[in-house]
A protein has these predicted regions:
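Catalytic centers of nucleases
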Residues: 32-96
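Acidic metal-coordinating catalytic centers involved in nucleic-acid phosphodiester chemistry
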Residues: 1-10, 82-168
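A near-ubiquitous, low-amplitude feature marking generic local secondary-structure context
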Residues: 23, 27, 51, 71, ...
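Generic ordered-secondary-structure signal
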Residues: 10-11, 16-24, 59, 68-69, ...
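Acidic-basic catalytic patches of nuclease active cores, encompassing PD-(D/E)XK
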Residues: 1-55
């Protein structure tokens, strides 16, 4: 399988997943979001080089503010289908209230559907201040960003990511 074939297949699989999330969300069925937290772990491990990434909700049911974390490499993820600025602000408020910055240097908000074109960095900076750095251009990611990151990998890694997406 050549690179172009893998990338095309990845795009098809991810676009189906995004559509499923959008439709489930419109129906008020949020179970797909919870299932995706676990399903995305091997993909995020590969893309972000986080071998110890795990679901924090397994540690504590409904872990507040963040869903996935790698305490060794100090990276956390909030996985959500909500794409508005308020969701990001709420996540950051909880992150700082719970002092997660003492365990995690980076936080990504992973939108399961297409993110907005932009988010107010000024609004975010008012929350984070000097306590924590969060850049809306790099730390708010969506399936398009996942595909872009995957396209920079070797074809063997892309195949592994494609395999994981097909399992979802």
């Amino acid at each position: 399988m050549d690179v172009l074939t893998v990338e095309n297949e990845l795009r098809q699989v991810v676009s189906r997943l995004v559509t499923q999330v959008e439709l489930a969300t419109k129906q008020g069925k949020l179970d797909i979001n919870l299932a995706l937290e676990d399903a995305l772990i091997p993909i995020l491990k590969e893309l972000f080089h986080l071998p110890k990434l795990h679901n924090l909700n397994a540690k504590q049911k409904n872990f507040p503010g963040i869903d996935l974390g790698d305490e060794f490499d100090r990276v956390a993820f909030q996985v959500t289908a909500t794409t508005d600025l308020e969701k990001i602000k709420k996540t950051l408020n909880v992150f700082i209230e719970k002092n997660y910055q003492s365990n995690f240097d980076e936080l990504y908000v992973l939108m399961l559907v297409k993110k907005q074109k932009s988010y107010s960095q000024l609004s975010i900076d008012k929350i984070t201040g000097d306590v924590f750095t969060f850049n809306t251009n790099t730390h708010v990611i969506d399936p398009g960003d996942i595909l872009a990151k995957a396209s920079n990998l070797r074809v063997t890694a892309q195949k592994r990511i494609l395999h994981e997406f097909k399992l979802i």
